[in-house]
Amino acid sequence: MTGAPWYHRDISRVRAEELLAHAGIDGSFLVRDSESVPGAYALCLLFQRHVHTYRILPDADGLLAVQATQGVQVNCFRTLGDLVLGYQNPNKGLVAPLLYPVMRESEANDESSDGDDEKPGSTFANSPPRAISPTATSPPSSSAAPHLLLQRLQELSPNSVGCEIVSLLDEYLHGNVCKDLENLKGGASGLQHFQGILSHICDSLHSEIDQTLSSLETLAKVFDHPSGHLTFSTMQNIGKSPEENMDNLLQKLTTLCNLLSSLEKRVLKALQEAVANHNLSLQPATPPESSRAPKKLARPNPVHSFQVKVVRYGRQTVSVDINEGVLLFDKKSGSFGVETVTLDRIVQLVKFQRGPAKLKMVVDSHHNPPRELVFESTKKREAFCRLLQLMKTTHSQKSELDVISVFVGTWNMGGTPPPGSLQSWVTCSGLGLTPDESISSLPHDIYAVGTQDNPQGEREWAEHIRATLRTSTNIDYKQVAVQSLWNIRLAVFVKPEHEARISQVNTASVKTGLGNTLGNKGAVGVSLLFNGTSMGFVNCHLTSGSDKALRRNHNFQDILRLLSLGEKQLSTFDISLRFNHLFWCGDLNYRLDLDALDILKHVSKREFEELMCADQLTRERHKRKAFFNFKEEKIMFPPTYRYERGSRDCYLWQKYKSSGVQVNGPSWCDRVLWKSYPESHVICTSYGCTDDIFTSEHSPVFATFEVGVISLFPRTESCSERASIELEAIEAIVKTSSKAKFFIEFHSRCLEEPRRSAENDSQYCEVPGFLKLGWSSKQLPKLHPVFSDLEHLRDQHLLLSVKSCDGFESYGECCVALRPTAGKLLDTFETCLTHRGEEMGSIRGRFRVYVPPDRRRIRERVYEWLSIEKDEREMMKDQLSPPSSSAFSIKAPSASYVASPNSYTNPAYFIFEEMPVFRKAEEIPSTIKESQVVCANNTVIQLPRVTGSHGHGKRSARRSDFTEIEIPGSLAPYKPSCETQSELSSAASSYQLFPGPHVPSTSPNQRHTTHSSNSSLQLQSHKNNMAPDSELSGKKLTNSYMNHSVFSRDMHKEKVRQDYQGVHQGRPVPIRNGPKLYPYVSTRVPAQCSASWIVEQPTPASGDNSLTALQIAKSLSEVDFQPADKKYPFHQMPSQQRQHGYDYGLASERNYSWEKEVSVLHGAPETVRELLSTLGLQRYTLDLSRSGWDDLDYFSGITEEELCAAGVSNPSHRRRILENLPKIWD
C-alpha cells in the first residue's frame, strides 16, 4: 500500500493541490494522509480545474471505504490499491474516474554531514569519501543486505543509540559493508571495514581502561601487602592496525577483570591482618555537624546612579534606590541640593524611538510638562527603565505579576564537556545587544536553556545549570522540566516564589534525522502555564550543510506540525498558535550564502547588516518558507560558528579531508526567535553571544525578554448579565482549488467549549487557485465568555480555523485579539491565515464585544506605565497610512471595473472589492496593463506578469487553466521586526486588505481618472529617474532586492519636484527611512558602497525563488498613487495623545513648511559621523567618540569648551559645529 507511487503519505493539502495543478489533466489523482482523522486517507481528484477531496475511512474490520452521504451504497476494499482500481471506472460515485496517478516526488535521503557534527578528535572526519559499488557489478544479496540493516537501524529506540554511531553505521551500510561481503567471497578471514568501526568506537575506551587500572593499582598498593600488589604497563595503541588495537584492548580488559575479581579479597585479607597484628578496631564515625548550608538570600539591590542631561536644567546625577522606592536627582550646582521623587509621583515614562537615549518622565500629573532626560547611551536608558519597573513591581500592592523576565539560551556544545563556569552566558555578558552592567546581575524569572550535541546526561547537565544560576544570583532555582532527544536537551528553571504559579507542564520531542526516524536531528519542547499565560519553549537542531536550506525549512514545518505541546483542545492548531508566547531557539544551521573571505572581511569591519542580506534564514523568512510571522531581534554580534576550539580569535572555515578541502564559512547558525499573540506585551531586551567560552566551535547565544503575563483568577462575583461576542460578518480568501463548502471553528480559553459557524453563504472563485468566502451574521454564532470582566477579556484571544465541510480539514488558522475591541461598540480585524507554517490566505471581519456596565473596570499594568511613543516623523507616517475600513459588505461580484483608493494593483483588493484580476486583457485599464514598473515607498517594484490559459486555442493538453504568476526580481520591502519589537502591534495581515476611506464627493469616474493620472505621474517619474544622470546598471536592478536603497537617493530630486507639482496641497510623505526588504539593511547609501558584493553578486542559481500570489499582493499594496491629504487628513492625531492634557509630540512639527520638511526628511544627519561629514569635519569623529560624544542627542548639547577639550582646536571649526547642531533640546 505505502509503496504505491500515487500514495504521498503526509504531504500537505496545499502541496497535493499544487501537484495536481502541475499535472493539469482531468482524472489526475493522488492519495495522502488525512489531516483531520488519524489513520484515514484523503483521495484528491482533479476535474475541471478544481480539486475534489474524498475522505477514505477504515471500519472496525480494517476495510477501507470512501465516505459517502447518507443513503449511498458504500463499497469496501481491503487495501488502498484495490480501492483505486475499483474507482478507475466511470459512474462509481466520484466526479470523474481515477485515470492518471500523480507520482510521488523523489526524496533524497542523503543525511550526510558536512563536518559540522563531528566530535573533536574524531578520525571519522579524515575517512575517505563514501564509495558505493555500481549497481551493475554488485550482486543482489549485497544490495539487499544493507537495505535490511538500514531498516533495523531506523527501528532502534533513540535512547539506545548514540549520535556518533549513527553516522558511522550510515557510512558503513552505504558502502563498506558491500566491500566486506565481497572480501569474504574472495577468501578474506575477517571484516576489515567493520573492525575499523569497532576500533574507532573503542578509541576512548583505551584511555578509560588505563585510568581505571591505574586507580585500582593505587588501591592495591594501599591495602595489599607490598609484595603482593599488581603491576601493569600501559599498552600503546597508536599507529597499530584495527586488528592489533582490538587485541590490545582485549588484553587490557582481561587484566581489568582479573584485578576486579581479586582486589576485594586482597583488601579484606589485608584488613584482617592489620586488626590481628596491631589490635585495631573499627570505631563508629562521629556524626558530622549539620553541613547543610544556610539558605542563600538574593543579593540586596544597591543604589544605581546615572549621569544624565535634563533639558533646561543641565547635567545631573539620577540615582535609583529600589529598596526605598525613590529617585534622587542630584543637580550638583545651585542651592537646591538633592531632589527626592517617590515612586507614586511618577505617572508615566515615555521612550522615543528616534531618540534612543532620551526619556520623558511625567511627574505628578499629565498636565505638567514632562522632564526630558538624555542618558549617555541607549543601554543606560534601558537599564534605568528596567530598574524603575523592578522598583514598581517590588512596591506594588497587587499580589499578581504583570510582567516577568525570561532568559532563553542556546549552545551547540560540540560533544565536549562544558567549562567550569557558564556565568557569562546566564548573565548575558559578551557581544551584541547586552544589558548594562548595573542590571546584568539581576535574576530572571524563567530560564530556558537549550543545548545540542550535549555529551552530559540529563541530571548532570541540569545540576550544572542550577549551580551556575545559584552562583550568579544567590537563588536556588526550581527545575520545571528537562526534555532530551539524544544529545538535544532543553531545561527550564523558575524562581522559587513562582513555583506555585506554574501549571500544565508538558514535554515532547520530534525526530527529523534520516527520514524523521532518527533523533540525531530534531527538536525538544517544554510548555507551561504561568498564571493565565501559556508559554512554549522549543530547542532544535536542524539539518546541517550550506546547500540544505530547503531541508531545514521542511524540518521546521515537521516540528511545527508534530511537536505535541500545549492544551489538547488546541491540537487543531500547530504550536505557533497554541501559546501566548512561543520561544524558539537552537542550532538552526542556516548559513551565509557568500564566499568565506568576503564574510571575514565584513566581520572584521563589524558590518553585520550587510551580511544579513546573504543570511539564509532571513531570506527564507522573507519568502515565507520558514518561521512565518516569527520575530528576531537585530543581530549585532559576529557569527557564532565556526570558531577554532580553545579561543575566539579566528574562524576555522577550512577543513582538510581526504576528499578535498571542505569550506564552512562563518555563519549565524545559533538563533533565538519568538512569536506572540497579537496585542501581547513582549520586548526583547538583549540578544548576543559570549566571548569567553571556548570549548566548542559554537559560541553560546542568549536572549532575554520582558513578557506580560495574565492573571489567573479574574473577579467571579455573580452578575445578572453575561458578556458576549457578536460576530457580524467575516470574509476570507483561501488558497485552494477546491469547490467545497466551509465553516469556521472558534477556540478560546475564555470559552467553555469550541463553537462552529454554519456553512458560508457566499463563495466566489474570481482568481484561479483562490476562493473568496463569506459568512453573514446569521451563519455566525454568538459567543459567551466564561468570565464577563473587561479586565479579563482584554487579555483574551480568539483562534479561528477555516475548515471544509466535506473532510473537516483545516484550510487556514489565525488568531484575533479581543483587546482592541473590549468595551467598544464595534471594531474590525484583518490578518493572514496560515496552515503548517505556510501562508494560506487572509481573513477579515467585524465583531462587537459587550461587557456589562458593572464589569468594565480595568487597571493599569506595569508595562503600560512605561510607554513607547513614536517621534514626530513616525507619527506623520502613521497618520498618512491607510486606516482600516470600518465596515464592509458581502455582495455579488460587479461586472464593471471601478477603481477605489488603494486597490488598483493588489490582487487581494480585487478579490475583496469585487474587481476583476488580471484575467482578461480587455478588463484592465491601459495604465495598468502597460505598466512594467512602479515607484512605491522609495523603491522600484517590478509588476508581476500574470499568465494563464485564457488565450484563444492556446490551452495545452497537459495543463489545466491555473494561473501562473512570474515573480519579479525586486521583492517587496517589509518592516523588520527590530523596528516594531517594542510596539504593541497586532499580528496584522502581511498585506493590506482594506481600501482607503471612501471619499463621498468623488464619483467613480473621477476616481478612475485620478488613478490613471496619478499612475501616469508615477510612471513618468520613474522614466525621468532612469535618465543618464542617475542611470542604474542592470546588475543593480536585478539585485535591488538586496539593497533597494540605491534607488532612493538617485531618484529623490526628480520625484520630490514632480510630487510637489502634482500634490502641492498635500503634506509630504516622510519616506526617508522607508521599509526595508531585509531586516537591518541600511537605507542610507554611503559615498562608496562598503559591501560591493551586494551589487555585483551574480544572478542567483535556479531554485525555489517563488512567492505566492498573496506575497505579490503585499508587494503591490505598497503602491499608493493618491495624494496624501485627500485620503488621510493630516490633522488626525492618535487617540492616546488626545486623551492626555499634554501633547508629547512636538507641536511645532505640525507647522513644517514643504521646504523644511524636505530638508528634514532627506538631509538631516542621524549620527555624529553624518553631521561631521556634512560639515566636512569628519576628521574629528574619532577624537569626539573617544571623549564620549558618540550619540547625536547627547552631542546636540555640547559647548565650545567641551569641543575644545575633545580636540577641536580650530575656532572656526568649533563655530561651524555649534551653528549646525540639531535643534532637539528645545
UniProtKB/Swiss-Prot annotation:
Alphabetical GO biological process terms: cell adhesion; immune system process; negative regulation of insulin-like growth factor receptor signaling pathway; phosphatidylinositol dephosphorylation; regulation of immune response
What membrane topology does the UniProt entry give?
A: Peripheral membrane protein
Q: Which gene encodes it?
A: inppl1b
SUPFAM superfamilies, per the entry: DNase I-like, SAM/Pointed domain, SH2 domain
Amino acid composition bias (Acidic residues), ranges on this chain:
108-117
Query: Does Nucleus count among this protein's keywords?
Result: yes
Protein name per UniProt: Phosphatidylinositol 3,4,5-trisphosphate 5-phosphatase 2B
Does the record carry Ribosomal protein as a key word?
no
